């Protein structure tokens, strides 16, 4: 059989089997994670034990000989051995073809690709990924990467079988993919891409959704389509759905359960709240999508999010969560990351992050996620993210290592080797500085910004500015993590002045926690912030159950006109909520014979 070694699929298989980067030596031989307290106390003292950090060195373009010796120990693992057998079979037919086929041109290429796809499907079928396999997420990333490559030519024999084996929780994946990409390709040629907002919504967040949509429609004067996803009749009652779709133009509701896209036995989404979010992203027909939590408050129009340079370059716009360290949890997270990235190493973006350098256990805040589904890599990564939120996987791995759905978005891109973009700054704070506590800037509202102009380079990573570096060096010299009180910072010092100059360049984007001061306690007391802040480190105070920011850069509310904007948002949100309460009290939207409580 004649096989073209330059075939794209052949090259992709070779890269997938051995990886483009030098591999870290495997330290553990167990096949599953030990989440016991004993494991949580594990520490990594020597550089050889350290799973990641500044001492990690990555070879950008290792030679084949270096690749062989650095991957040898990885190939001893079960998943590595399976890939090795697959690679050897592939090379056997490359180097020693059994017979020639009298075909030429595209026919020869199609024959080669079909043969390798058959081998790959057999590998996926014979080696299903278990929820707690030590390197299961890494293997799933490899399979997702291959899937994205094959999306360019889905007419290959066995492709749909591979698709079904890879995404068994979506029985109609072939129909979903065909309908979506036919529309997306047509849209790219004949009409503008379709933009929309997607939100997973339950009855407990009805008030927040009212305020969110009121702000979009009345404050920003945006008519961007909005889809509200729920799961089952009890999740979002009919009278609430009726009000949302009649009061606001261009708003629709979608029952994911009735939609029938997903296998409930595998996804187990009933009464799961945030786990619905990646499935809503998969289900929507929008091309460019903003996924939003109901309690997110936009400080810029939704259209501005889609215009960010990082989004245009990569098809993704991600925001960081709080920069917070917790030793017990860090051991589990670092073990997971090392196990699943030891074969390839981190991407350039991840290698530079505070998360990788063990300065925090949170990386992404999923209150706002912006993606371009017309890109095949983005589409494939969203399927991988949804897989991480299926019932057994989230219960046995994802939600035991991380905190809900948050990390499943960027992690899908990272493990599949796809490009993605994060705003540079980790979450800051907005609120009343020193209102009741001297521990720092305590706030229930993480604050997010757009990058300052000029901080994005061509590959989507961030160019570290001299001002940020100067602030970091000054803070490091002044105090260790969380050891210096913010009151001791001299506002006239060079470091503080440089930090404030840098902060003026960013633009407020959004914050978490709704317009309420404490949403879990009162539905009537609205925020009245006196300052906003970026940078610094977060600390959780166990006794008072408060999140407080230390060593931050504080800015007045007058900066960027944020004080005026917040007051206008509160006014718009309260008017929208008042209309809703009035309609509900009159019973205008109650189904016949139904009684319900008026939302507080």
Spans of features found by a protein language model:
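Short, low-complexity, Lys/Arg-enriched N-terminal segments of secretory-pathway carbohydrate enzymes
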Residues: 1-74
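Glycosyltransferase catalytic domains, chiefly GT-A lineage
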Residues: 45-600
């Amino acid at each position: 059989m004649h096989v073209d070694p330059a075939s794209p699929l052949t090259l992709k298989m070779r890269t997938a089997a051995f990886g483009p980067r030098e591999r870290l030596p495997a330290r553990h031989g167990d096949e599953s994670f030990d989440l016991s307290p004993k494991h949580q106390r594990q520490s990594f003292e020597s550089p050889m034990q350290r799973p990641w950090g500044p001492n990690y060195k990555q070879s950008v373009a290792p030679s084949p000989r270096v690749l062989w010796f650095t991957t040898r120990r990885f190939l001893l693992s079960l998943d590595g051995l399976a890939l090795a057998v697959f690679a050897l079979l592939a090379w056997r037919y490359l180097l020693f073809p059994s017979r020639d086929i009298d075909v030429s041109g595209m026919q020869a290429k199609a024959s080669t690709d079909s043969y390798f796809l058959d081998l790959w499907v057999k590998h996926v079928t014979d080696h299903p990924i278990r929820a707690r396999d030590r390197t299961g997420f890494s293997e799933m990333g490899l399979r997702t990467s291959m899937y994205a490559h094959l999306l360019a030519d889905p007419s290959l024999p066995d492709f749909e079988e591979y698709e079904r084996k890879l995404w068994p929780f979506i029985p109609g994946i072939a129909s979903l993919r065909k309908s979506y990409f036919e529309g997306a390709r047509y849209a790219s040629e004949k009409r503008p891409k379709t933009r929309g907002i997607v939100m997973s919504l339950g009855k407990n967040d009805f008030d927040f959704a009212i305020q969110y949509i009121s702000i979009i429609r009345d404050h920003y004067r945006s008519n961007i389509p909005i889809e509200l996803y729920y799961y089952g009749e009890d999740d979002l009652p009919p009278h609430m759905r009726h009000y949302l779709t009649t009061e606001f133009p261009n708003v629709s509701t979608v029952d994911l359960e009735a939609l029938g896209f997903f296998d409930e036995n595998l996804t187990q989404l009933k009464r799961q709240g945030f786990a619905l979010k990646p499935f809503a992203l998969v289900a929507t027909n929008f091309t460019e999508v903003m996924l939003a939590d109901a309690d997110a408050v936009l400080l810029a129009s939704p259209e501005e999010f889609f215009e960010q340079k990082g989004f245009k370059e990569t098809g993704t716009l991600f925001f960081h969560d709080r920069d917070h360290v917790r030793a017990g949890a860090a051991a589990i997270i670092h073990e997971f990351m090392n196990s699943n990235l030891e074969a390839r190493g981190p991407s350039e973006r991840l290698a530079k992050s505070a998360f990788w350098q063990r300065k925090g256990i949170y990386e992404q805040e999923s209150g706002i996620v912006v993606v371009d589904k017309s890109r095949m890599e983005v589409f494939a990564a969203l399927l991988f993210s949804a897989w991480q939120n299926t019932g057994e996987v989230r219960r046995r791995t994802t939600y035991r290592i991380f905190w809900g759905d948050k990390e499943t978005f960027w992690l899908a891109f990272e493990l599949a080797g796809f490009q993605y973009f994060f705003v540079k700054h980790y979450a800051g704070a907005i609120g009343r500085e020193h209102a009741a506590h001297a521990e720092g800037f305590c706030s229930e509202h993480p604050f997010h910004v757009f990058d300052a102009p000029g901080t994005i380079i061509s590959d989507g990573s961030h160019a570290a500015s001299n001002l940020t570096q100067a602030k970091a060096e000054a803070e490091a010299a002044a105090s260790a993590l969380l050891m210096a009180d913010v009151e001791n910072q001299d506002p006239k010092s060079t470091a503080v002045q440089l930090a404030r100059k840098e902060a003026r360049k960013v633009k407020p984007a959004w914050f978490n926690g709704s317009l309420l001061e404490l949403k879990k306690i009162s539905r009537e007391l609205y925020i009245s912030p006196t300052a906003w802040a970026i940078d610094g480190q977060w600390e959780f105070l166990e006794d008072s159950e408060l999140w407080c920011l230390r060593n931050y850069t504080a800015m007045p509310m007058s900066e960027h006109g944020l004080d005026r904007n917040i007051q206008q948002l509160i006014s718009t949100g309260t008017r929208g909520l008042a209309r809703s309460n009035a309609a509900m009290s009159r019973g205008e939207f109650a189904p016949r014979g139904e009684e319900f409580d008026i939302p507080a």
